[in-house]
Amino acid sequence: MIYAELAGGLGNQMFVYAFARALGLRCGEGVTLLDRQDWRDGAPAHTACALEALAISPGVRILSEPQFAKTHLPRQNAAKALMIKYEQRRGLLARDWQPFERRMAPLLNMIGLHFATDGYTPAHRGPSRDFLAWGYFQSERYFADAAGTIRRELRAKTPPTGSFAAAIAAARWPVAVHLRRGDYLKPENEILQVCTPEYYAAAVAAVAAAKPEAELFVFTDDEPWAREHLPTAGLPATILPQGAAANDLALMQRCRGFVLSNSTYSWWAQYLADAPDKIVWAPDRWYAHTKRSDLYLPGWRRIATQTHP
């Protein structure tokens, strides 16, 4: 059995699902996702499991038993705890851990653990009866061989309806603009403070230059700020009230253009979009410091970002 621990909001949970599901298909094994409720105490970035609103495979089980790994996978869980402690003591967010995690992967895979917080670290199943995955797995390379399956299974079970869905359908060239503020503005998340007002101004100007007929649909966790400060470059703009994560994601997917924040949530919106002529504008850095990202895809138009003071 392949086990993977869920973390973060819907976008991060989708990457964990995609990694584990693709590995399960490769190995012909079942998948259980461990919904760590205990992580959410005092940690709002770790939200409730939202995957059940998506068309995930009925063969993927979601288990809400916080101590499962500690009780049933003691060897893998102990190795995971040591890796977390080592990286946290040396600055989990401030450093690029991919080279270290790649060096450790063969040994960890042999004992039934895959640990990957940064970039792409290939996973090898190893001989252990049970296999535990912990990390963020934020790279399409983890599931490229199962991309069709992943795209089908990570769509909303219920297609969006209502006035906003109708407005997007009626627009000549709808563009989803994702503006994330909230937890990104906290001092401890300085590494995520990339998408400044200047970034959005430049990105929207690029949209207007490329597609003068574009209409903006703004998805944000800070509607008042967006109404007062978000530049539109003269394009018509609709600022949507924040709704359920899966429904908003499904609305974004119906657009043809995408202005991304450095968020996995907007990454999935563009990835799952069907428009053959879609255009993606993204910040040229995913992190404010030296950490690298494997999230960039061919064809994206990168917008220069200022170094955070």
Give residue spans per PLM region.
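Extreme N-terminal starter segment of soluble prokaryotic enzymes
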Residues: 1-3
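A short, glycine/small-residue-rich beta-strand->loop->alpha-helix junction that serves as a flexible
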Residues: 5-15
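Short, solvent-exposed loop/turn segments at secondary-structure junctions
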Residues: 9-11, 37-41, 137-141, 180-184, ...
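Donor-binding and catalytic core of enzymes assembling or modifying cell-surface/extracellular glycoconjugates
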Residues: 10, 205-290
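Histidine-anchored nucleotide/phosphate-binding helix
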Residues: 13-25, 200-208
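A short beta-strand-loop structural module common to alpha/beta enzyme folds
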Residues: 27-41
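Secretory-pathway luminal glycosyltransferase catalytic domains
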Residues: 46-206, 210-211
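Leloir-type glycosyltransferase catalytic cores
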Residues: 288-309
